Curated annotation (Swiss-Prot):
Cofactor note: Binds 2 magnesium ions per tetramer.
Protein name: Phenylalanine--tRNA ligase alpha subunit
PANTHER family: PHENYLALANINE--TRNA LIGASE, MITOCHONDRIAL (PTHR11538:SF41), PHENYLALANYL-TRNA SYNTHETASE (PTHR11538)
Annotated source species: Geobacter metallireducens (strain ATCC 53774 / DSM 7210 / GS-15)
Cofactor(s) of this protein: Mg(2+)
Ranges annotated as spanning the membrane: none
Family: Belongs to the class-II aminoacyl-tRNA synthetase family. Phe-tRNA synthetase alpha subunit type 1 subfamily.
Catalytic reactions of this protein: tRNA(Phe) + L-phenylalanine + ATP = L-phenylalanyl-tRNA(Phe) + AMP + diphosphate + H(+)
A GO cellular component entry from the record: cytoplasm
Record CDD domains: PheRS_alpha_core
Keywords in alphabetical order: Aminoacyl-tRNA synthetase, ATP-binding, Cytoplasm, Ligase, Magnesium, Metal-binding, Nucleotide-binding, Protein biosynthesis
Keyword Magnesium: yes
Length: 338
């Protein structure tokens, strides 16, 4: 039986050395060391040996088994290493080659308009202030002279979370928060997203506004008109006509709607301006004393103005866009034009 074990070992080692794949080595492991393998068959014959021969042959069989397992594991590691080297050689990358060129993105037209308007007002001494989009009723309405029973609240279709929390309907709450934190003088603009329950070709339930605030001693309506005229001339071009019409906003008094000469027909009258020659772009006015009282300012010693414009409205006039929904449809053909 010793000769049989020695012959089995030599034959197995030779076959293992000749195996060139993991599959072949696995088959040899089963052939020699499996439950029905050659070595297992030999060890089953130990019972027929004498008591003196059995431990000697059994120890030899275990030695053969250990040698075969060790050689199988070593050869398997070599085969796997060779396979890995071959794959790396086959899939080798030339790291000196230039990378794939990705298409360049562009800024969204709304972002471009916000940045351009912000830059103009920065040149006029205004800084950018921001605030939360989910607001308290106090900041969005009450502090801006919208009492709970005020009919002016019906002018805005509001998304309410509960009785006191809502999605802001304008960025004016930023002005209230700023005045509560800072003493005059204050000069800010507050660009941001606002929400109203409205949706059609010229309205969206989510849109963008830029509102401005200036509070100091001796601020007049003439200052308001001068700053807004300066903005219009910088943004739409010099020589654009500007007019102010009386209007109403709960947080300003007096209040005005600001129109510019139609950028499409140069004031001659067309379909866009409904033959009037004028286009409304923003609302403005002198801050109501009641707003000052809510933020702790003394209306007897300071004065100021506020204004606000819809960014989409300005962008539509700037670029001649007829449908507000184009800004939100994510149509690459439209966005690539900017």
């Amino acid at each position: 039986m010793k000769e049989q074990l020695d012959g089995l070992l030599q034959s197995a080692l030779k076959e293992i050395d000749g195996a060139g794949s993991e599959e072949a080595l696995q088959e040899l492991r089963i052939k020699y060391l499996g439950k029905k393998g050659a070595l297992t068959a030999v060890m089953k014959g130990l019972g027929a040996l004498s008591a003196e021969e059995r431990p000697v042959v059994g120890q030899l069989a275990n030695t053969v088994k250990d040698q075969l397992e060790a050689h199988l594991d070593e050869t398997l590691a070599q085969v796997r290493d060779a396979s890995k080297r071959e794959r790396l050689q086959r899939e080798r990358l030339d790291v000196t080659l230039p990378g794939r060129r990705l298409p360049h993105g562009t800024k969204h037209p709304i972002t471009l308009v916000i940045e351009e308007i912000s830059e103009i007002f920065a040149g006029l001494g205004f800084r950018v202030a921001e605030g939360p989009e989910v607001e308290l009723d106090f900041y969005n309405f009450e502090a801006l002279n919208f009492p709970k029973d005020h009919p002016a609240r019906d002018m805005q279709d509001t998304f309410f979370v509960d009785d006191s929390i809502l999605l802001r309907t304008h960025t004016s709450p930023v002005q209230v928060r700023t005045m509560l934190k800072h003493a005059p003088p204050v000069r800010i603009i507050s660009p941001g997203t606002v929400y109203r329950c409205d949706s059609d070709a010229t309205h969206s339930p989510m849109f963008h506004q830029i509102e401005g605030l200036m509070v100091d001693t001796g601020v007049t309506f003439g200052d308001l008109k001068g700053i807004l005229t300066n903005f219009v001339n910088q943004y739409f071009g010099k020589g654009i006509g500007v007019r102010l019409r009386p209007s109403f906003f709960p947080f300003t008094e007096p209040s005005a709607e600001v129109d510019i000469a139609c950028v499409m027909c140069k004031g001659k009258g067309c379909r866009v301006c409904k033959e009037s020659g004028w286009l409304e772009i923003l609302g403005a006015g002198m801050i109501d004393p009641e707003v000052y009282r809510h933020v702790g300012y003394d209306p007897e010693t300071i004065s100021g103005f506020a204004f606000g414009m819809g960014v989409e409205r300005v962008a539509m006039l700037k670029y001649g866009i007829g449908d507000l929904r184009l800004f939100f449809d994510n149509d690459v053909r439209f966005l690539q034009q900017f």
